[in-house]
Amino acid sequence: MATIYCTATSLDGYIADDDESLTWLFTTPGGAAPGSTAGADDESAPELHFDRFFAGVGSIVCGANTIEWVRRDLTKDGQPFVWPYSQPTWVVTHRDLDPVDGVEYFAGDIADLHPRLVEAAAGRDVWVVGGGDLAGQFADLGLLDRVWIHQCAVVLGYGRPLLPRRLRLHRRQLDTDGQFTAMLFDVVGPEPRDSA
């Protein structure tokens, strides 16, 4: 079991554009749609394929912007919003958001939430979906074990940063998957600033 920040990023380090859109990701050939498990059992899929990651997830945590993006961009033709994942999910927010089946809202301290995520994961991984600042809050408390990045062959020029923290990582694995470069890192700890 590990707590893993797994996300896709542009070549220039953005996880969403300034409009909170991920259209750039889902229009890239091979981009995994939320809730997809298409390649999880595909023996020919790269080891670091998104769908293989999804298969090991036991619980999910994300921020309010993430669930609002999913609600806005994945709700089709006036259909009711359905959270695309079956795993127990928490949304860290201080806003009043509409209830969503299968999603619990949390406005407390990440240190208090983490044990609940681990228990719900039942020996599987905790997926920190994002955004980057939420992943940073887990890292600040020493609760983030790994960073799993799928770097997409696109340059956005602006947007939401991948992980707005100074962290030292150790690369475990590197793989390619179509138009993506997949990288798995262990979190070593904070990267100190030069005192000079």
Residue map of PLM features:
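Enzymes that bind and transform nitrogen-containing heteroaromatic metabolites
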Residues: 1-196
